Amino acid sequence: MDLLQAAHACLQACDPVEKVALTQQYAAAFRAGSLPLPAQADAPEPICMPGRPPRPLLVHPRELPRRGLGTPEGRAAFIHAIAHIELNAIDLAWDAVYRFRGVPDGFYADWVAVADDESRHFMLL
């Protein structure tokens, strides 16, 4: 497996816990030098939407009830929203790794580090 295949696998992972585990595994392997960049790579396959679990159903935020931070439900909804932001940040970082070909190695290293950081943020929530 190479770094671009790892990025694709992370983008396709539907379970958030699996996505985080793969991210941390591949980031560690990349740092250790055991997940190489391919010398030549074909154009990336289009990814319309990163993997998501089948439930809960994604809805527009306007369709959700407004909750203030003064209630336990409101605080839970706030943390849930932040978790979504962190999960999307993981996908955005892997998308940058997967989508852009032929850029300097440091570009990939930086985005792998971002994905790894965002996975830790997700787990903190």
Language-model features and meaning:
Residues 1-125:
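Non-heme di-metal
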